[in-house]
Each structure stands twice: as C-alpha cells, then as structure tokens.
C-alpha cells in the first residue's frame, strides 16, 4: 500500500507525535502540513494568521496539503484542515484518512503540558478548556465524515500506532 495516510483531529490529539513514529514504522516519509507551511514562509502559524487572517491561512493550508500529498507519505494535518470542503474531498479521494479521536479532557491536559501559544493562535479568545470544547463540538462531525478509520488517541503513541496498523491491514484486505 502506497496511498498517502492523512492524520486528522483536533490540536493535542497526537497527529505529529503519532505521525512521525507511524511513518518510521511503515518506512514512509512524514510531513506535518503546519510545519511545512511554516518552513516555506519562514513564519509561525500565529504570524501567518496575524498577517493574512484565518481565511488567508486556510487558503495556504489547502495549497500545502496539495503540495505535500505523495505516495508512501504520512501527513499530519492542521486541526482545522477539515473546515474546507475541498480539503475533505481531496483527502478522502487521494488517500486513507485516519481520525485521531480524544475527549476534551485529554486534549486540554496535553495542550497544557506542551503549550505552543506562539505557534497556535486562539480560535475563540476563550480559556483553553472552553475553546477545545467549542472547537471539538464544531468539528467532530466533519472529522468523522471524512475519516476512513477512527482511532482512540487517548492511549500511548505506540498503542495508537498499533491500532492504526491493524485498521490499515483490515482496510487493505477488504
């Protein structure tokens, strides 16, 4: 199987952490769309949003998604990539989409343990727990709609990777 694997989910679900290790275990290339975009523009996500607003960032995010999609690649996407209908269809039609699902409490704990305020501007201006709750309520249905595979991301990365590999094996054998 050489189809790209797209990891989707909210901030803190483990897309980058799991993605790097998954790519290594599958002998694939790893790309994080946010990190790729930042390296191309030499700006943080916060700086891009400040300069171009969220709409400008979302347009660049779509271009990044198209640019990094290639066979044998694990792609960690930004949490809001599913907000754009084009991106949802693109991922669904060009690879296997894996939703790393986790409850608000887990996401908040992870985000508080590794704060990245300089890299991730607030979406709502609200306290972190309220923002995560609101954003997940808004996006969960979209994540589920586009996902070929849904994985419980509350476990340790090694367990999450094992579950993804098992789900991929079942998907391929169907």
From Swiss-Prot:
Q: Name its co-factor(s).
A: Mg(2+)
The function of this protein is: Catalyzes the specific phosphorylation of the 3-hydroxyl group of shikimic acid using ATP as a cosubstrate.
What does the sequence similarity comment in the record state about its family? Answer: Belongs to the shikimate kinase family. AroL subfamily.
Q: What keywords does the record list, in alphabetical order?
A: Amino-acid biosynthesis, Aromatic amino acid biosynthesis, ATP-binding, Cytoplasm, Kinase, Magnesium, Metal-binding, Nucleotide-binding, Transferase
Q: Which residues form a coiled coil?
A: none
**For this protein, what reaction is catalysed?**
shikimate + ATP = 3-phosphoshikimate + ADP + H(+)
Gene3D superfamilies registered for this protein in UniProt:
P-loop containing nucleotide triphosphate hydrolases
InterPro entries according to UniProt: P-loop_NTPase (IPR027417), Shikimate/glucono_kinase (IPR031322), Shikimate_kinase/TSH1 (IPR000623), Shikimate_kinase_2 (IPR027544), Shikimate_kinase_CS (IPR023000)
Its main localization is cytoplasm
Q: What class of enzyme is it?
A: transferase
**EC identifiers of the protein:** 2.7.1.71
Q: What is this protein called?
A: Shikimate kinase 2
> What is its subcellular localisation?
Cytoplasm
> What is written about domains in the entry's comments?
The LID domain closes over the active site upon ATP binding.
CDD domains according to UniProt = SK
A Pfam family hit: SKI
Q: Name one GO biological process term.
A: aromatic amino acid family biosynthetic process
Q: What note does UniProt attach to the cofactor annotation?
A: Binds 1 Mg(2+) ion per subunit.
**Residues noted as binding substrate in the record, renumbered to the chain:** 34, 58, 79, 139
Q: Where is Mg(2+) annotated to bind? A: 16, 32
Subunit details: Monomer.
Q: Where is this region: LID domain?
A: 112-126
GO terms for CC? cytosol
In this chain, ATP is annotated as bound at: 12-17, 120
């Amino acid at each position: 199987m050489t189809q790209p694997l797209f990891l989707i989910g909210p901030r803190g679900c483990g897309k980058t952490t799991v993605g790097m290790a998954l790519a290594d275990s599958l002998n694939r290339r790893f790309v994080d769309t946010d990190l790729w975009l930042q390296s191309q523009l030499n700006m943080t996500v916060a700086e891009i949003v400040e300069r171009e607003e969220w709409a400008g960032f979302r347009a660049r995010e779509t271009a990044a998604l198209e640019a990094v999609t290639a066979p044998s690649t694990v792609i960690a996407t930004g949490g809001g990539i599913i907000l754009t209908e084009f991106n949802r269809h693109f991922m669904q039609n060009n690879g296997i989409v894996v939703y790393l699902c986790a409850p608000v409490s887990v996401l908040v704990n992870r985000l508080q343990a590794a704060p990245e305020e300089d890299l991730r501007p607030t979406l709502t201006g609200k306290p972190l727990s309220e923002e995560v709750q609101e954003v997940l309520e808004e996006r969960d249905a979209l994540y589920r709609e586009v996902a070929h595979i849904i994985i419980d991301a509350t476990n340790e990365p090694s367990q999450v990777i094992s579950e993804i590999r098992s789900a991929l094996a079942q998907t391929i054998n169907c």
